[in-house]
Amino acid sequence: MTTRSVVVKVGTSSVTDATGGVDHSVLGDLAGDVVSLMRQGWEVVVVTSGAITAGWAEVGGGRSRPHDAVTLQAVSAVGQPLLMSAWRDAFARQGVAVGQVLLAPLDFSNRGQYLHARSTLAALKSLGVVPIVNENDAVADAEIRFGDNDRIAALVANLVAASHLVLLTDTEGLFTADPRLDPGATLIEEVRAFDATLLALAGSSISGVGSGGMASKLAAAHMATWSGVTTVIAPARASAPLSSSLAETSGFGTIFRPRPERLSARKAWIAFAVASTGTVSINQGALQALEHHGRSLLRVGVTGHTGTFEDGDAVDVLGPLGEVVAKGLVRVGAENFDDGDDVVIHRDDLVLLRRP
């Protein structure tokens, strides 16, 4: 894994101003921060939001976002070139070129597309070009699009084997309570494990102009830490926010430590990039074999299945109490489940999800 590689995601409320247009001042400051790190030997990938909001402002729509899918896709097509032009200008002032990379769910769920995307990003970085990533909103299927760039940023961090993921946003980090409602809320500076209490701290987006919010950032941090990526949620409009995040400046943002046992790139891809198409329920004996002995899932331990999955599809594995305990790629389809191979999911294609 590259030890000095970071993916930085910048939210809509940070890259746009009060009118909804691109905030060139913020982009200029961030570009300077990125280039400073590059000169110190860091590889940087930028994931940017803001195309929809910028496009909506360009066509006279005002600050609030539209809600119907067709309009969202249309204004994204208007805003994306505005956003890229602003990023290009910001980095050009630093003497650095940028390259646009538009990604869709298929680029992560299809193994071939996944590898092509990785090669493209690697080639851009080898040329000294900063990749600027966004979801391909203009043509994405409304039913399968990610809808927020926090998850994309976590997947990109896995894709490029980054050591760090920095989510720059309109808050100071994760607080003990909603600071808008509780004046006694304090910043949580470090998180070492995810639990229900932590996830309950997520609220809605403060700005109201993006599609993310703290819940999506926590989900992205959860994904990234499973991939062995140190993650930081920090304020975008602070001075040198990316450098401060990587330096772990005291009192700046919230840092999420990675799990001690990081997933391999392939297993992280199975766990987080591929959508499940069904479920397979197992008994207690099978659960013990998976969690304590590292075995493959055999048909004898299966108590039922749902969905229309085919050979090679991803499914959620449910324990005796109905909880998701693992995820994997099946070796037999739902239609011929009882007649196929005794191995339902090989251990090389299985990711356990209950280990701390």
Task: Describe each model-derived feature in a short phrase.
Residues 1-97, 101-356:
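C-terminal catalytic "cap/lid" subdomain
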